[in-house]
């Protein structure tokens, strides 16, 4: 029986607002192995949890994260996003690290800008979490920059979706593996819809585990677990945890 994949709780898991303390706290209370958050950096170098560069405010105004200081942003009420009626404040990456470390979880930092590499790496080192952090959101170029600036943090190559749609699966898999190896990546992170058995086999030959995102359908979770992926990112953490318990209780 294959090992069950690592469970990554996507930010906003279990119907919480994305990139909020509530989302992180909910993920920490779950049986997920890895907590995912999106990372951007303010003008003064503060790593924050945010997907988009432009913050849309309830009154229709907008603010640029990279062009604003953290002090300018920290008091702003931000909409919780689609499906949520509340607001939240911008969260510093540093503020969640002690709880993640204490919980013994891993952290998937989805880097949304090159500037996030050093800010996130410095905090990872300061909190002694190099063994618990993965950098994702890295195409080949960003992965190479991350290796140069923060070689102590493991990276996953974000496979180029466009390549898989244009080059054909075998050639795209070969290029993804070559890019991952040349950038010193620990594995490949890919949209589950592009992760076929050909990629898994090609990556396995190179010693590269494959992680898939974002799988919320329990039937698809089972399919990718059986295919042999190393990790599955999901918003539906409870369903993946249930499948894991069923998987591990099955006779070998």
Q: Where do the protein language model's features map onto the residues?
A:
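Phosphate-group recognition and catalysis centered on beta-loop-alpha active-site segments
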Residues: 1-252
């Amino acid at each position: 029986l294959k090992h069950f994949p690592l469970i990554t709780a996507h930010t906003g898991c279990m119907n919480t607002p994305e990139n909020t303390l509530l989302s992180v706290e909910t993920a920490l209370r779950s049986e997920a192995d890895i907590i995912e958050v999106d990372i951007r950096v303010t003008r003064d170098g503060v790593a924050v949890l945010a997907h988009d560069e432009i913050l849309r405010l309830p009154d229709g105004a907008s603010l640029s994260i990279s062009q604003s200081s953290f002090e300018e942003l920290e008091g702003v009420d931000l909409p919780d996003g689609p499906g949520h009626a509340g607001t939240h404040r911008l969260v510093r990456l540093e503020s969640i690290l002690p709880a993640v470390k204490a919980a013994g979880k891993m952290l998937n930092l989805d880097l949304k800008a090159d500037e996030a590499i050093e800010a996130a790496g410095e905090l990872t080192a300061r909190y002694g979490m190099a063994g618990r952090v993965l950098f994702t959101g890295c195409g080949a170029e960003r992965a190479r920059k991350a290796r140069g600036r923060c070689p102590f943090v493991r990276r996953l190559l974000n496979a180029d979706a466009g390549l898989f749609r244009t080059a054909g699966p075998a050639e795209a898999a070969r290029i993804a593996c070559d890019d991952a190896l040349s950038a010193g990546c620990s594995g490949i992170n890919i949209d589950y819809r592009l992760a076929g058995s050909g990629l898994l086999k090609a990556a396995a030959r190179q010693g590269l585990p494959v992680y898939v995102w974002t799988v919320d359908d329990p039937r698809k979770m089972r399919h990718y677990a059986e295919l042999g992926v190393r990790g599955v990112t999901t918003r539906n953490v409870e369903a993946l945890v249930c499948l894991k318990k069923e998987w591990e209780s099955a006779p070998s």
